[in-house]
């Protein structure tokens, strides 16, 4: 919490250091990333900040992955975007910054900062950098995306035999056998393949690519490769599983809604999961569900996991003082 608060305060000070003697209003919009979707936790950080800077008022709006993108788009069109927004590089850098809506944060990216981040994960620096070489995101946290199963149901269906419980991995064949065991034991729906929106696409994408060692892009990240032979084979396998009644395609839901259906006990696994979801859903979990995180199934049982990085970016709202800061 202390580290997150310090990083958050540094961004606020970027916005306010030229107007320190006057009252300043800052708007912050945040997607539900860990405790940043928890108003009580955010209020604690703001209280700590205001104890030092009582002249700076921060107004927070909490977005979700169902309507958040539309709210940002509407705000951009109406020129009412917030000062600060918290999300990941796929939105901050690849979307809004590429459209010229964000402020460069190069002043925050000192040699010391870059060295510190590289010491933890060398890929993070590049994800925060736009094609023009400027930095548009300041990272706060990262985690690996995975899936999760209801261990209670798997044990009742004798499906845990298809899982390496020590490494939390399974093969594509083991995944199929586990689905069949669940259905035969009366646990249906097993898993839900969703696609109503962008939210949670990291889950279904990783499911498809891992099944037969496919890739989402080429090594240079200049070309999407979802139409590769390996990925077509993965999509075909999922269609076969659906035709057999072992898994369900539901085009009406997104990743957040899939999580909700898992948490309330409707389905027995979720493909859109990470460590933050444990905290987000601990008070919503239906009785009898035992969470057991899993890597995505792969042909040889050795998965490739994608990491998620989240942080802050600043919208360019045309305020000369804020731009100068």
Segments and roles (model prediction):
Residues 1-8:
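Positively charged n-region of N-terminal signal peptides that target proteins for export
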Residues 6, 20-99, 111-117, 161, ...:
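Conserved N-terminal structural module of periplasmic/extracytoplasmic solute-binding proteins
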Residues 13-17, 21:
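Hydrophobic core
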Residues 31, 38, 46, 94, ...:
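Extracytoplasmic/periplasmic substrate-binding proteins
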Residues 51, 109-113, 126-199, 214-252, ...:
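Helix-loop-helix "hinge/cap" segment bordering the ligand-binding cleft or interdomain interface
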Residues 62-71, 90-91, 168-174, 250-264:
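Short helix-initiation/N-cap motifs at beta->coil->alpha
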Residues 76-87, 101-103, 188, 264-273:
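Alpha-to-beta junction loops
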């Amino acid at each position: 919490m202390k580290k997150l608060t310090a990083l958050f305060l540094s961004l606020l000070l970027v916005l306010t250091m030229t107007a320190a003697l006057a009252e300043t209003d800052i708007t912050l919009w945040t997607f539900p990333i860990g405790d940043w979707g928890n108003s009580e936790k955010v209020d604690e950080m703001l209280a700590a900040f205001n104890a030092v800077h009582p002249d700076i008022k921060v107004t927070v709006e909490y977005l979700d992955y169902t309507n958040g993108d539309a709210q940002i788009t509407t705000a951009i069109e109406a020129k009412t975007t917030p000062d600060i927004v918290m999300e990941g590089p796929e939105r901050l850098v690849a979307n809004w910054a590429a459209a010229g809506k964000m402020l460069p944060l190069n002043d925050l990216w000192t040699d010391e900062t870059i060295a510190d981040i590289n010491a933890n994960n060398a890929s993070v620096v590049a994800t925060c950098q736009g094609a023009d070489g400027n930095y548009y995101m300041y990272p706060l946290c990262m985690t690996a995306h995975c899936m999760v199963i209801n261990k209670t149901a798997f044990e009742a269906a004798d499906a845990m035999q298809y899982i390496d419980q020590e490494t939390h991995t399974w093969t594509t064949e083991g995944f199929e056998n586990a689905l069949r065991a669940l259905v035969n034991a009366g646990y249906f729906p097993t898993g839900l393949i969703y696609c109503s929106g962008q939210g949670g696409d990291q889950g279904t994408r990783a499911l498809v690519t891992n099944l037969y060692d496919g890739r989402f892009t080429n090594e240079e990240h200049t070309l999407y490769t979802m139409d590769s032979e390996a990925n077509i084979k993965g999509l075909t396998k999922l269609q076969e599983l659906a035709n057999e009644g072992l898994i369900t395609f539901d085009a009406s839901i997104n990743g957040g809604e899939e999580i909700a259906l898992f948490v309330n006990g409707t389905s027995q696994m979720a493909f859109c999961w990470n460590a933050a979801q444990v905290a987000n859903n601990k008070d919503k979990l239906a009785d009898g569900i035992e969470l057991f995180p899993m890597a995505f199934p792969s042909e040889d049982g050795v998965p490739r996991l994608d990491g998620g990085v989240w942080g802050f970016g600043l919208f360019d709202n045309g305020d000369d003082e804020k731009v100068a800061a």
